[in-house]
Amino acid sequence: MAFKIYTKTGDKGETGLFGGKRLPKYHLRIEAYGTVDELNAYLGLVRDSLGDEATRDVLKEIQDRLFTIGANLASDPDKSMSTPDLLDSDIEALEQQMDLMDTHLPPLKNFILPGGHPSVSYCHIARTVCRRAERQVVALAANEPVEEILLRYLNRLSDYLFVLSRKMAQDLGVEEVSWFARK
């Protein structure tokens, strides 16, 4: 029998975690992994807008890691379950990519306004969704067990997406627009 997308079990506003526990769809855990899923969709949009195969490969790996985070958040914390691992080396890979991109970028002297090209804007949207996901996971961690590495990865990922947006703008020949406070 083929797997069906629709189950009808969520028609009354609840959804199930891996492990069977049912939660209302407004629960912070559901919001957190739903936002990670939203981030993953935006990263697909960014990846699809790039011609650089190496960066596309990095983004695909990041999307895989976001599924790992989603699986972890979608699992019942009260049950001992085997979920895919997120590793320190995953965070180190983001840091290495940022360091590499930074060697090609001018020093940052001011805040910059998002935009300049649709693909750069998509990357900034992904960055802000990542920050929202991070805030939701932090809020969840204040009430329930959450692996600390998930928070570190999301924090580092938003930094990576900021640097990537700058590198994309540079590669596209788009001038960064600095923000200056009105006086």
Which residues fall in each region the model found?
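Phosphate/pyrophosphate-binding loop motifs in nucleotide- or prenyl diphosphate-using proteins
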Residues: M1-K183
